[in-house]
């Protein structure tokens, strides 16, 4: 249900209107996902998963709860204890993870890689928790529970430039699939509170700066905005109203591999510390979904629409033909609306619900085996076979490009 106090193009109002999710006081900063919203969420997750698996990442899963000792060693306890949900006390004190990187480090230490195994790329769609102040919570854009498309690259010094450049080259094409073509980049440098010495920070900042300079990417340098363990490149998407939303990031980290003593065996048999790159495409799935709604409103790209096609029979006698059309569209997300409302009202409801394609079938369509397809901006009547092909093409355009690299 849409909140009447919100502007109609606010993502929170759209989430209610489109029946995607809701929030309530008993779970502040956490979304209750409805079937339509969960469909959209899973589509975003699947797109990111296809992209990273095609890029040589291996997917893992790490525990939600880790003992305090892990967070002290990573530096998160000292820097962010107030924003972590802690449970227990004494030696059993633990915290829900606000990030997945310490868990990934535990896996890599067990894998004990050699130089032949590097770069080692690990990905996780990890649910994380952060105790954000109540006044800062803002729909899907600022939550206490959310899912990071978290990835880490463990590599050698010599591999840093190639890995960062590869990420930077591929990201614009990934965002373009969702309708974002204006992407800006910021280089965030050492904050006042940080891990590691100045020499390591000099080296890390120089490495990221050299990569973007080599690629010819203009950057906005932001002193003091880096992560506690290293500098980062941040990617902001500009929406249809000119607002910038920070989403993707890649961060260079020499500190955490040293704190956890994460090493690889080089070609000479020596054990050396790995370099760790933290990276994300969306930042969080929930936040990116909110940004999508702020950008597209209810008119999401057809491949992302929770319901892609609404088949509207003119009268009850056209229901069997509508069922036949739906049977030809197996694999798409299709509904039939043969309710008691007028034809015009049912078509309007479909568009109000964000359904991008409406297939209208009446006497002439049944007799001539055709379908009238009404999109958001035009209408065309096609023979049944052509109509099915047209609908499939519209609904799958861009949907299967997740495995393509460097588009």
What are these regions (language model features)?
Residues 1-407:
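NTP/phosphate- and nucleic-acid-binding module
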């Amino acid at each position: 249900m849409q909140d009447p106090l919100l502007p109609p193009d606010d993502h929170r109002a759209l989430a209610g209107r489109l029946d995607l999710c809701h929030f309530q006081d008993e779970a502040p900063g956490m979304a209750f996902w409805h079937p339509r919203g969960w469909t959209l969420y899973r589509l975003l997750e699947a797109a990111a998963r296809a992209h990273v698996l095609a890029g040589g990442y291996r997917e893992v899963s790490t525990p939600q709860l880790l003992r305090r000792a892990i967070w002290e060693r990573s530096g998160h306890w000292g820097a962010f204890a107030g924003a972590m949900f802690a449970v227990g006390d004494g030696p059993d004190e633990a915290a829900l993870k606000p990030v997945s990187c310490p868990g990934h480090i535990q896996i890599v230490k067990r894998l004990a890689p050699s130089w032949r195994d590097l770069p080692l790329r690990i990905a996780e769609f990890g649910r994380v928790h952060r105790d954000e102040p109540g006044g800062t919570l803002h729909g899907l854009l600022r939550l206490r529970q959310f899912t990071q498309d978290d990835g880490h690259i463990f590599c050698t010094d010599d591999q840093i430039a190639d890995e960062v450049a590869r990420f930077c080259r591929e990201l614009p094409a990934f965002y373009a699939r969702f309708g974002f073509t204006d992407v800006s980049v910021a280089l965030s440098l050492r904050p006042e509170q940080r891990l590691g010495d100045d020499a390591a920070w000099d080296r890390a900042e120089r490495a990221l700066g050299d990569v973007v300079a080599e690629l010819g990417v203009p950057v906005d340098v932001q002193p003091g905005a880096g992560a506690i363990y290293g500098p980062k490149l941040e990617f902001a998407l500009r929406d249809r109203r000119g607002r910038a939303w920070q989403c993707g990031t890649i961060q260079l980290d020499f500190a955490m591999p040293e704190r956890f003593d994460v090493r690889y065996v080089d070609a000479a048999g020596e054990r050396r510390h790995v370099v760790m790159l933290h990276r994300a495409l969306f930042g969080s799935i929930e936040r990116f979904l909110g940004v999508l709604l702020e950008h597209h409103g209810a008119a999401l790209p057809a491949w992302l629409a929770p319901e892609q096609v609404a088949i509207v029979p003119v009268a009850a006698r056209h229901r069997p033909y509508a069922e036949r059309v739906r049977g030809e569209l197996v694999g798409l997300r299709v509904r039939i609306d043969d309710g008691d409302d007028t034809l015009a009202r049912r078509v309007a409801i479909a568009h109000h619900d964000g359904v991008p394609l409406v297939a209208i079938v009446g006497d002439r369509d049944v007799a001539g085996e055709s379908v009238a397809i009404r999109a958001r901006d035009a209408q065309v009547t096609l023979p049944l076979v052509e109509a099915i092909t047209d609908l499939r093409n519209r609904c799958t355009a861009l949907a299967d490009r997740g495995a393509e690299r460097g588009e």
